[in-house]
Regions:
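Accessory C-terminal segments flanking Radical SAM cores
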Residues: 57, 73-80, 85-88
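Short, P/G- and charge-enriched loop/turn segments at secondary-structure junctions
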Residues: 8-9, 23-25, 53, 88-90
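CBM-like, beta-strand-rich accessory domains located in the C-terminal region of large
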Residues: 84-390
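Extracellular polysaccharide-recognition and catalytic grooves
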Residues: 1, 19-63, 74
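Short, small-residue-biased leader/transition segments that mark boundaries at the very start
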Residues: 6-21
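Structural recognition of the beta-strand scaffold that forms the well-ordered cores
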Residues: 36, 49, 67-69, 74-78, ...
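Histidine-centered active-site/metal-ligand motif
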Residues: 10, 57-63, 70, 99-100, ...
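Residues that flank catalytic or metal-binding motifs in active/ligand-binding sites
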Residues: 17, 31-33, 46, 62-64, ...
Length: 390
């Protein structure tokens, strides 16, 4: 029944009203590691789908991979599939290289997992859907634990931008690369990549750990991400297609990756969000300005498992929090302290001066929206919750 719903929309004459059957725009199928988030159930709406679960046989080596449908096109796509007896299935389509994942020293999940399975599976957690703000966490550490001790991928969808935050740590120093399988015309413009297919268009904008090198003269930008074009078989096996790898030149064993995927309303849209990279003591983040709204996004560098027996408190821009990540939105021309819209990921408190905006006995995932005297909350994290809000 589930697969019928996923593949084919039931006719409106079915027993259940269409609007009732598809009431939720987000769904987490935690047992087998799927999550879907969409902005509506209208035709050609935008959908983000994330996978992080078991690997074996039909379930590919794609922990933490994702696809995006936008205006009827899988604009960020999966590498595909082919007839099982063909060597391309086991050599490419099944493997991590055919999916939108992070590789370390050129390696993804061990290739033998196709036949022996992944002893440690991937997981998806903490799905939140508050309309224009959605979130899910993918933990793909287990399937790549031969190289990684942390392989977390956060998806934070705010308005018309999907922010993908990678929290990565490996057992040894080496090189990281991000894979992108696109379905459309690929055009690099400065630090952005535009992908367009008919009326569907997105911008891929890497922001951390580095920007994309601004020009093709990558030797002028030795610390920035450089790109590689890789040829792979098409799904029909009649030719080849190109996918892309963004390489970090530095050899490290811990990195935070932050990529913005901007969902354009039309291919010619020029009014795109302005994003300013910002950093402070023990945090990195962004200030996003668009359509009269400012959003400040903070990522806590102390809350990634590096501390033991100490709290991960940071004080960015006058805020005080132990949250792994938080965002605050407010109208342009006003002050952040008067904000009413918050996103908090794995935090127990948010304070500013003598004011407590949020306090909990356990760390939670929270979206808060306030208007007039109405307060809307979406909370995930503990079976029993004891918390207060301003």
């Amino acid at each position: 029944f589930f697969f019928f719903l996923m593949i084919r929309r039931p006719p409106r004459s079915t027993l259940f009203p269409y609007t009732t059957l598809f009431r939720s725009t987000s769904q987490l199928f935690s047992d087998f590691g799927w999550a879907t988030m969409r902005n509506s159930w209208e035709k050609d709406a935008t959908m983000l789908a994330v996978k992080s679960g078991h690997t074996w046989n039909h379930s590919h080596a794609d922990a933490n991979s994702f696809i995006i449908f936008h205006k009827g096109v899988d604009i960020i796509k999966d590498g595909g599939n082919c007839w099982y007896p063909n060597p391309a299935y086991r050599n490419y389509f099944f493997q991590s290289q055919a999916h939108n994942v992070v590789l370390f020293n050129g390696e993804g999940q061990p290739r033998e997992q196709q036949y022996s399975g992944s002893t440690l599976r991937g997981y998806l957690y903490h799905l939140l859907d508050a309309g224009n703000v959605k979130y899910v966490l993918a933990n793909g550490t287990g399937p790549v634990s031969n190289n990684f001790s942390r392989n977390f991928r956060h998806f934070l969808w705010m308005d018309d931008v999907i922010y993908m935050i990678d929290d990565l740590k490996t057992h040894k120093v080496g090189r990281f690369e991000w894979l992108w399988h696109t379905n459309g015309t690929y055009k690099k413009s400065g630090v952005d990549v535009n992908v367009t297919n008919g009326n569907s268009s997105v911008v891929i904008r890497p922001l951390y750990p580095r920007l994309l090198a601004k020009s093709d003269f990558v030797h002028d930008y030795p610390e920035d991400l450089y790109w590689e074009e890789i040829q792979a078989p098409t799904e029909d096996l009649k030719g080849t297609e190109t996918y892309y790898s963004f390489h970090l030149p530095a050899e490290v064993n811990r990195v935070k990756g932050l990529t913005a995927i901007i969902l354009k309303d039309t291919p010619d849209e020029k009014d795109l969000p302005q994003m300013e990279r910002r950093e402070g003591q023990d945090w990195i983040g962004l200030r996003i300005r668009h359509k009269g709204k400012v959003t400040d996004l903070y990522i806590n560098q102390l809350a990634d498992g590096r501390l033991m027996h100490s709290n991960s408190w940071i004080m960015p821009d006058g805020w005080m929090t132990d949250a792994y990540m938080f965002a605050v939105s407010y109208p342009e021309g006003t002050e952040a302290k008067n904000a009413k819209d918050f996103f908090i990921a794995y935090g127990s408190a948010l304070r500013r001066g003598n004011e407590t905006y949020f306090s909990s006995l356990a760390k939670l995932f929270v979206i808060q929206k306030a208007e007039d005297k109405k307060l809307d909350l979406w909370i995930n994290g503990q079976p029993k919750i004891n918390t207060t809000f301003r």
